[in-house]
Amino acid sequence: MKVPMLVLSAMIAILFATMIPSSFAITSNTSPIFFSGPMIPSSSQPVSPNVVTGVSQFYSANWAGYAYNGTKDTITKAQGSWIQPAVTCTPGKNDSQVAAFWVGIDGLTSKTVEQTGTLAYCPQGSSTASYYAWYEFYPAQPAKFVSKVTVNPGDKFEGIISFNSTSSKFTVTLKDLTTGIHFTKSNPAGFTGKRSSAECIAEDPAGGNSAADGLYYLANFGTVQFGQDYTAAKNTCSVTVNGKIHAIGSLGARTDELTMVNYYVPTIIMAQPSTLSTDKKSFTAIWESLGY
């Protein structure tokens, strides 16, 4: 699906106007405002499956990684893990640089996302990155930081998103496997999700001011490692569909490989995933460019 430039910019502007609390501001001394929203398709797409890995292949303006593209009301859990990469800031740019790493349910083809992860943030003009733990039930609320979990480069993280069919509640848990500290949060009242996709993703979040599409520069994270092969966290990255656990890359054409590119100039690659491990659970995502 192609999203016209003016429509995309208008959508992001409306989101900012209606969802960012007026008491929030972005300065070099505060944490960033960002939205880890649904996947934004690029202005052009490959049209054939990736015959090398046996999965479907797409370009995205904000996501890089792997996703399961399922059907509504079938997913009850998504599990992911990663090693927090050290970010290199690039001073002299006219906006901040951000990179988010997360596991979630929904957002691939729906307008909701239930997710938790970590974030690296380089304030405009700074050469030093700050790191945060966060969760989000989009679009019910902007991403919320959790100070209980301190994020350091090299730490291993595990995220779990689960749905309780009895209470109709989503629960997100993020655990620093290196320190043992974790948090758990449930969705706000009235929130509902489609439960139609699951993802392990490196993202360029929305919230930036310099680009017409509203995205930040993608911070240089080098390489981020996802999955059990790197973290030893069991069943990561995986999705539970109709009660059965599947490796996220084991579902053939239902598995989407996502390469992040500049929305307006899709030949500019920002980040791309590696092929999947033998067990289809693990992969790396490699930073390629700031994007603009």
Map each language-model feature to its residues.
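Exposed, interaction-prone regions of secreted/extracellular proteins
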Residues: 24-292
